[in-house]
Amino acid sequence: MTQEQLLKNLQVPSGIVDVILDTDAYNETDDQYAIAYMLLSPERINVLGLCAAPFHNANSSSPEDGMVRSYDEILHLLDLMDRNELATKVYRGARGYLPDENTPIETDASKFIVAEAKKHSPEHPLYVVAIGAITNVASAILMDRETMVNNTVIVWLGGHAKDYPHTREFNMYQDIAAARIVFGCGVPFVQLPCRGVVSHLTTTGPELTYWIKGTSKLADYLYEHTVWEADKYAKGKVWNRCIWDVSAVAWLLNDNDRFMSSYPIPALIPQYDNTYSVDPRRHPMCYVYEIKRDAIFGDLFAKLRNMK
């Protein structure tokens, strides 16, 4: 890929683009919103498939269990949206994290990503939107680096802002090796940092009640699941909840910077000590530095309310 084409692919695409979503959908509440937002945006997004990513926290007993639960949650969301025709396009991903920076974990998900990438080109790339540990995507790169670097654009919600004190963010620290592969391989790469940038994308129970509660089965599920998660730690208290993952889908819809602002920087280097290193000689990546919270939620809520 030429440098000119790389820089072009770091810009928000125009028209309808092919997208694969890689998601740890059972992790918390935000993945469900992102899946819904993606499927409710056919004017810009042609969904080729969804891949389940591993995760391990209080909602899973292991990374493998997290992936399996995420796979099931994706199917549940498709059922709520009456989109069961996509069930055959949902793929199980890695059952753990990369053992090192050279060994892929070959799964249905990583094989699917590579196979679809081969059908695309630098001029008409495949967009891989990742909103969990980026294990499946890094595995695809290790399996066929040339195809992935030339024919895809990777959009990732992960890491923290480059001036944040550390990078110990859930999606990144689970699989630092995978993050280092993606940041370092030369693929057109868009980072939406969590703390310091996307952390602005919060909502509340009263706001969800006003805008989406009672409008559909899906909307009620999103509302109830969000309140249920918040009640675990803040029942009877004031709370807000960041809907992180919606931002990665919103980047694809970001005409004229209506949802966020970004600029190219030399690709950051995630380190195993939870910091970034910087090398000005590195290839460019797209770094999102500002989120327009009201605009994103306005579009998301309108699509949820108008869902047929």
Describe the predicted segments one by one.
Residues 1-308:
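N-terminal acidic, glycine/proline-rich low-complexity segments
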